[in-house]
Regions:
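Catalytic core of non-heme Fe(II) oxygenases with the double-stranded beta-helix
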Residues: 84-193
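Non-heme Fe(II)/2-oxoglutarate
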Residues: 1-94
Length: 193
């Protein structure tokens, strides 16, 4: 895990090699298992336009409560298990007390034509990890921060942590064909009080 505290164009934390080799394999395997369980935006707390239309077009699942029926008894999602490593990065860099926060874990998948229009999250910090099996199979999908005209590419195993009140969007994904599981997976951890 390579952690970099960045101040430009806004304060954020960038993590490269977010997972070690074994963890990354475990996460990709879990994503393969989760893929058929993913649901539309009406089930993943999507932000909405003024007319009530969802701002996102993708699929996802909250791991904290929706996945439990699919897990072996006593077995927790590896993605949920690993989130504590990331939580420690926030606690160590911003001097927060762990016990004051609740974490929610959302897995999302962006295939051909999918996007998430500009929005803020109702939380303190948002953390997004990109997981892509083959970046050559798609284009687009950058996490864009319109107030700063700045974006981060969806590179496998890279994480960004930023204040949830910062407007952000996922730019449209383009693919010659919607190859299942070869678009962009994101794991979003939302830190709330």
């Amino acid at each position: 895990m390579i952690v970099e505290l960045c101040y430009e164009p806004f304060e954020h934390i960038l993590i490269k090699e977010s997972y070690d080799h074994n963890q990354l394999n475990n996460v990709h395997n879990e994503l393969d298992t989760l893929f058929p369980l993913l649901k539309g935006p009406q089930y993943t707390m999507s932000a909405e336009e003024k007319d009530g239309q969802y701002k996102k077009k993708n699929k996802g699942i909250f791991l904290d409560y929706e996945m439990q029926p699919y897990c072996d008894i006593g077995k927790e999602s590896v993605i949920v298990q690993y989130r504590n490593f990331f939580f420690d990065v926030i606690v160590n860099n911003y001097k927060y007390e762990k016990s004051n926060y609740e974490l929610k874990s959302l897995v999302s998948y962006y295939g051909d034509g999918d996007r998430y229009r500009s929005h803020v999250d109702h939380a303190i910090y948002t953390m997004v990890t990109f997981l892509c099996k083959d970046n050559a199979k798609f284009s687009g999908g950058q996490l864009f921060f319109p107030e700063y005209n700045w974006s981060i590419d969806p590179i496998d195993n890279v994480t960004i942590i930023f204040p949830s009140s910062t407007y952000h969007e996922v730019l449209p994904v383009k693919s010659s064909e919607d190859l299942n599981r070869y678009g962009i997976f994101t794991i979003t951890y939302i830190f709330t009080i």
